[in-house]
From Swiss-Prot:
Keyword Secreted applies: yes
Motif range (Cell attachment site): 42-44
Single GO term (MF): toxin activity
Name assigned to this protein: Disintegrin schistatin-like subunit B
Species: Echis carinatus (Saw-scaled viper)
Compartments reported by the entry: Secreted
Length: 63
């Protein structure tokens, strides 16, 4: 197993000063900027965007 550079192996939480370990809105241990597309629209839906405060990709409320 490779060690995740964002993760404190003792606590399984982000290393001090880092924001996140993984997720569609996490890159190199930091949250992606608000407004970054994390899921492109399919069909008649709308794109989903990162919030800048979580590693998750929330569903667009207009979908």
């Amino acid at each position: 197993n490779s060690v995740n550079p964002c993760c404190d192996p003792q606590t399984c939480k982000p290393i001090e000063g880092k924001h996140c370990i993984s997720g569609p809105c996490c890159e190199n241990c930091y949250f992606l900027r608000s407004g970054t597309i994390c899921q492109r629209a399919r069909g008649d839906g709308n794109n989903d965007y990162c919030t800048g405060i979580t590693p998750d990709c929330p569903r667009n409320r207009y979908n």
